[in-house]
Amino acid sequence: MSDTPPATPVSFPEFSPVSTAQWQAQLARELKGADPASLRWTMPDGLVAEPFYHREALTALGGAPPPLPPRPAPCRNVVALTVPAGTDGRLQIEQAADALARGAGGIHFILNKEVANFALGELADRLPLATTWIGYTVLQQPDQLLERLRDISPNEPLLGFLRFAPITVPEGAELAMYRTALRRCLELARGWANFPVLAVNGAFFGNRGATLTQQVAYSLSTAATMLAYLPDEECGITVADVAANFHLDFAIGTSYFPEIARLRATRRLWATLLHAYGLPPQGAADLLIHASTSTWTQTTLDPHTNLLRHTTEAMSAVLGGADSIQVAAYDCLYQHYTEFSARLARNQPLILLEEAHLDWVADPAAGSYFLETLTDELARAAWVEFQALEAKGGMLEARNQAMEAISKVGLEKFKRIATGQDVVVGTNRFQNAQEKFDFQPKQLLRSRDFDTTRATYPSEVLRLATALHFERRANQDKQATLVLLGNAAVNEEIAAAFWHLLHPGQTSQPPMPDIASDSYSVLFSKPDEATLMYATPAQFDHLARVVQQVPVGHIFDIPSLINSDLATLLEAVRVFGFKEFLVEGHRTEEVLARLQGR
């Protein structure tokens, strides 16, 4: 418009430029003679952050590096939903539809069993696959999942990604055993430009304590292995096809600025890797980076502090240029999906994206003296580490050495947390002395699902063991009861009743629990909850004899009710192998809580 005033260059002539020498002199005065070097921050990678940075920092880099290109699409808020083994995922599909209606920008299904069981037909009926961003993590048969997706959506490309994470082989070594399946995935995904099917799972390394340098280097090595071994002339798969189908998964930790720099350094090195294989380096801008909050930094104690950790981690991901963010529930270490914690996790990125608008600026870290320097140093260190690993044969040949290096770093972190050198709020500093656990410590420590790879796990074990000691003393004053309900048919009736209550309106037959027909159905009634269990007749007979102190060989009628102190019965059901009755992966108390709206 004609009345619009001309733009005026920003200038502050009233302020004189301050040189590096002047800053150093002022710093010395503020420290009253102390060595300014004492303010340096040494990271686990060995990189050193200076007390301050000046414009000369960019001069040392040869000038300000060009900013990263804008994202091809807005950053997505992705909700992860785990489909338990033995289920078809209908419950998770319902949860996915609800999450998308409440602000989620995408869904990530983690399939814990055969992909043939997953209700893709139901998914296609509930969600338009061509326009809904959906990621899939599978433990086996990735090509079969893609074949089913291709059959359901034959003429429309998909949005999202496929991540193959087989549990039968180590991370980074799946190529040797599954090369044929991965090539088949590439063939099936042709034409799906926004659905990469080759995962570089950097989160695997990060969630085991790898330094930022190691995470970038080992991820590059995994990608280089695929670029070298997946192309196939007979199948018509070129190195460009492989490169175009990568997506990179990173776990973002709480080290705020270094995490921003790590993501920026990764894109720069990705361009270098593409160039090394004769591909346009501009393709690095199209690399999908899926960032998730780190399990390595998550804590079981004082779990609400995880909300704050996840917020800084998500901020680092957005500002560093991630294309999608997946925030875990603050309490996911000790319990399954709950609507309350799921809503908080879903809303954290929404606030960052919809209220703070952190993704409205392309590469907001560009030009920062500190972040540009840190990005450059991280990139250089990671490239050196990558080249060293490649010289040993890459991830296929030298994976054990890489994992040993990660273990060494993780052990050092364990020690620093145990001695208080590294602060973990709520775990080794500023603990909540009146904390009431939302879980049973003994049950959690014995659970196969409890993550023992986290940084705070050793410290948590000590705290929980102490809690167990006092809990057992308290339980000796509490009474509990085992009630014999009947045979396995009772459990089947209970399972059917719970299933129909959880899935109102469903007319199909509910899945029956996998329980032997001669098993007993048992109710374990405790002061604060009731748990359905099952056991063989021999197990129940042995427990009854021990608890009621019946001599071996003495004939007695199996009682229908056994009373004792809680501590004794808790130990007895464990020793004699009583199994907890689960409904779609949920404990009795969880099912009852859901039915009661808790």
Regions found by a protein language model. Give the residues of each.
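Active-site capping/gating regions of soluble enzymes
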Residues: 2, 226, 247-440, 579-582, ...
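A short alpha-helix capping/helix-coil boundary motif
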Residues: 73-74, 246, 291-294, 364-366, ...
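Short linear motifs at secondary-structure transitions and domain/linker junctions
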Residues: 25-27, 53-57, 173-175, 223, ...
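Short, surface-exposed linear patches
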Residues: 63-65, 101-105, 182-186, 220-223, ...
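Intrinsic disorder at enzyme termini
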Residues: 5-16, 34-41, 47-66, 323, ...
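Short, hydrophobic/aliphatic alpha-helical segments
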Residues: 31-34, 304-313, 476-480
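Catalytic alpha/beta active-site cores
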Residues: 2-255, 259, 318, 324-328, ...
